[in-house]
Amino acid sequence: GLTAGRVSPETALFPYVTVDKIHESAANTGSKTLLRVDTQDGCHYWEPFNREHDDRFSVSRHLYKNVLGNKICFEEINHDLQLAFRYTWMSSDSYGFVRQCEFHNQGDKSVSVDLLDGLQNILPADTPFSAQTNSSNLVDAYKWSELDEQTGMAFFTLYSGIADRAEPYESLKASTVFCLGLESPTILLCSDQLDGFRRGEPIQQELLKRGVRGAYLVNARLELAPGSSQCWQLVANIQQSQGQAVELRRQLGEPLKVAETITQSVNKGNDRLARIVASADGFQVTAEETVSAHHYANTVFNLLRGGIFDDQYQVSSNDFAGTVKSFNRNLYQRHVVMLEGLPELLNVSQLQSIIKDQADPQLERLGLEYLPITFGRRHGDPSRPWNQFAIRLKDQNGDRLLSYQGNWRDVFQNWEALTFSFPEFIESVIAKFVNASTMDGYNPYRITKEGIDWEVEDPDDPWSYIGYWGDHQIIYLQILLELSNQFHPEELGKLLLRYIFCYANVPFRI
């Protein structure tokens, strides 16, 4: 989510780049921590997680992830200085990305620490993905970073929309970052003073920076008694409107209350994730705790790629009616009275029965392939065009949204596993598979709730192709058919006699 965005790469906190570039840019993108440690032996400079400094101290590094899978902790222990620094990434639906930091004195002597910690290369809101990928230096010229001294909240924006046309083009949203837990820190908006800090020079607060990559770095003095710790948080969010930014600024007038609200929001997300995984039978108890955790992790990864059926076998009539309307407006108009008269929620079998009573094969086709799926949020390396998706969990009003997107191979692999927990949807997955296949036996490379997608071939790009293949067809369909026969032995024979299936129409022929 930090680089792939909360919805899409256009709404990322850090640049969405290939994994090799993520490793190469570790020194100037993402988390950064510099420490000047005063002990009885003198002043020591320590930069956690900087491998170029491995020869300076004896250190141990650890990476932890909670069992739920939604928190990741980076830890470095300096055995020479008897100090430990760790930070944990977690997420809040209301506040965005939360970076919880802890600095611990493991020794038996007091230490004084000059801390500089924060985030580098923060993307402003509304940064176009294509411009950031192909013209990042140009994007830098548009960057405007500003600090609100009263609350310590920084705004990362574009001075204007990025365009080369003689017309007004405003950019009115901001990425925001603020700090909780440190007493009156000095705040930097870019990385220019890092080298000065390394040389022991004092830090000067920055109120406005233009035309450079944004950063949010806090400088504070920590006094740690033996065995004591200091904790703080950096909280970052993207695509904040003017109203949202003003409201956040107002809330930061009571920082303790904000910290408590963030904790509640994170815990609420934990509970929601646990319930989602539980609905797909992700929790089990065995004599081997690691086996149970491994099963849970497999279930989470499956759901992250394929999604989850939203409310067991309950279906939203409004969402189903909207799906019919988006696929076939004429069909929707023919059955608008029936669709609008449906209960707000009904069981999927009840819906299928009502649809059959209409004696309309087109409506029956759309009804059978309807999948009320949400939550799936797969992203991958951006060098693969089929890995880029918009993961929409809410609509423009903030209401829950049923939506899914995935490349063909991944989505049907994961739906296959999902149907073991939701066997009444097996035939719907089969219908989606068959109806999205082409007459010549191939499949499009991406499938979404709105339909199918295929790649537009670029003759000058040897990696580009038409974007659909047939190599995954037979085995996937065979397994789905076997599952149907296992759970519903009579259903396949009935489906073969019904004229409710179709071929996908794509602008290519093999």
Q: What are the roles of these predicted feature ranges?
A:
Residues 1-510:
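Anionic coordination/interaction segments
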